[in-house]
Amino acid sequence: MSAWVLPDHIADVLPSEARHIEELRRQLLDTARGYGYELVMPPLLEHLESLLSGTGEALDLQTFKLVDQLSGRSMGLRADTTPQVARIDAHLLNREGVARLCYCGPVLHTRPDRPHATREPLQFGAEIYGHAGLEADTEVLLLALDCLHASGLSDGVIVDLADARIVRALFAGVPVDAAVLARVHAALVAKDASELHALTRSFPAASRDGLRALVQLYGDASVLDEAAKALKGTPAVSAALAGLKQLAASLGADPARQISFDLADLRGYAYYSGMRFGIYVPGAADALVRGGRYDEVGAVFGRNRPAVGFSLDVRELVGVLPARPLRAAIRAPWSDAAGLREAIAGLRKAGEIVVCVLPGHGSEIDEFHCDRELVEHAGQWQVRAL
């Protein structure tokens, strides 16, 4: 095999895309900072038990594992940043009140999430710790939408809402082994009514009927009224439905944005403890942004604080945005002529891009559009349009 061939689903980022990614990274972090979120930078490598705290089997399977040559302990390359941020909140910051934290860095996956996906996403996220109320849920969702808007995505956005408490409440008190539970979850996600009917035949009536009803409970806000009738009698379900209705109302009416509900959406079921959302945009094969409430994530660190947040892959975000135009630049000769270096330094200090053409070469730069040049006229260096 050639030495230049990279592993499957791993790719270099070339100049034009790299510039776009970096500009978006800065825009996203600045948007989060505008909400009061503080930047943290956890390490890429960490002890395995910290990386897999309260995250379920899926993240375990996605994590690259190795042995530390210094200590002999099992370590992992992070597949998700949230457990690390939970550790920072619990033990390093150790604040009593609300902590707003954001991050942006690479994660590594053993397998791609879907066909053609990278195994090295650049994950951006924002999280609130310390507030259990719906206000925190609303803020992170509004921030996620503002991040997309800052990136240039505002039309055709679909916000899909669900709540993990609904399915948990329907399973409460039902003796079912892990294998059957996994099959029920798969049937709900696939909206497979016949499979779900067979699997729940022996369940108590309330759980059986409620789970079977879920496969039909998706669509616009009217779904919540239908769910209130079909799933009545469970306080946890009533609270979840009321929260979803209030959350949707908090977003307000926007003709460029659609709000939908899918009460059988169980992605991240082992991870989320309450409200969860996905944001879909034109051109993306799946949800571009995912988030929700995960109050149990800090339990392993001895400080189980309320937590809610979201994340997205910046590289995937770039893929659904139009290519950005080349940056305008000034072409300058490579020379020891008097005043040239001072003129170039002054232009760069003023924010201009100045590309010096090396002897024997023309302007071969793909990333910049040299629409001006620096020329000498009457003993002075001046910028002239090309």
Swiss-Prot record:
GO terms for molecular function: histidine-tRNA ligase activity. It comes from the Bacteria. Pathway: Amino-acid biosynthesis; L-histidine biosynthesis; L-histidine from 5-phospho-alpha-D-ribose 1-diphosphate: step 1/9. SUPFAM superfamilies: Class II aaRS and biotin synthetases (SSF55681). Keywords: Amino-acid biosynthesis, Cytoplasm, Histidine biosynthesis. InterPro entries: aa-tRNA-synth_II/BPL/LPL (IPR045864), HisRS-like_core (IPR041715), HisRS/HisZ (IPR004516), HisZ (IPR004517). Required for the first step of histidine biosynthesis. May allow the feedback regulation of ATP phosphoribosyltransferase activity by histidine. Heteromultimer composed of HisG and HisZ subunits. This function is generally fulfilled by the C-terminal part of HisG, which is missing in some bacteria such as this one. This is ATP phosphoribosyltransferase regulatory subunit. The gene is hisZ.
